[in-house]
Amino acid sequence: MATGKQILNEAKDKMAKSGDALRRTLADIRAGRANASLLNGVKVDYYGAPTPLNQVASITIPEARQLLVTPYDESSLDNIEKAIYAANLGLTPQNDGSAIRILIPQLTEERRKELVKDVKAELEKAKVAVRNVRREAMDDLKKGNKDGDFNDDEFHDLEKKVQTETDNGIKNLENIAADKEKELMG
């Protein structure tokens, strides 16, 4: 059976991973600026196999609101253009014969508000994940207490520590989401 400290450390690690996952998810929500990660999910039909865009082309940011996609193999230019359209990112690629330029449109106020709603929805999912970790840790602690692995005082102390970690984890998630909201509305 795991010790109280092991249960607490495992819960801390899982809660930290929820924060990392939220950060990664929110990075994909664009804020009106060019960012190569906007194209992370794009798969290009490259000789019959769906291949991530970053493996068939270099993605650079020549200006604040422009991406430049330069294929390693110019024959794949049309497939790259089709893949960007098919990804439904709301972006319009412009093929100039040797590379593809993508202008990132300014976000409208309405679109910004929609994106903030998306941020809040992702925040809620992450909070649920943290609460599930808390529940698992509490269940493990109760089982350990019942099995006699630690006494009632240790159990209550560990229970408080798990709750403190949960509160800290949720506060961290809220800070991550608040930063993204500021970025979107800024």
Curated annotation (Swiss-Prot):
A single BP term in Gene Ontology: translational termination
Regions that span the bilayer: none
CDD domains linked: RRF
GO cellular component, one term: cytoplasm
Lineage of the species this protein comes from: Bacteria, Bacillati, Bacillota, Bacilli, Lactobacillales
Main location group: cytoplasm
Keywords, comma-separated and alphabetical: Cytoplasm, Protein biosynthesis
Function: Responsible for the release of ribosomes from messenger RNA at the termination of protein biosynthesis. May increase the efficiency of translation by recycling ribosomes from one round of translation to another.
Matches recorded under SUPFAM superfamilies: Ribosome recycling factor, RRF
Gene: frr
Signal sequence annotation: none
Pfam families: RRF
Intracellular or extracellular location(s): Cytoplasm
Family from the record: Belongs to the RRF family.
Protein name according to UniProt: Ribosome-recycling factor
Native source organism of the sequence: Limosilactobacillus reuteri
Any GO MF annotation of the entry: ribosomal large subunit binding
InterPro entries with a match to the protein in the record: Ribosome_recyc_fac (IPR002661), Ribosome_recyc_fac_dom (IPR023584), RRF_sf (IPR036191)
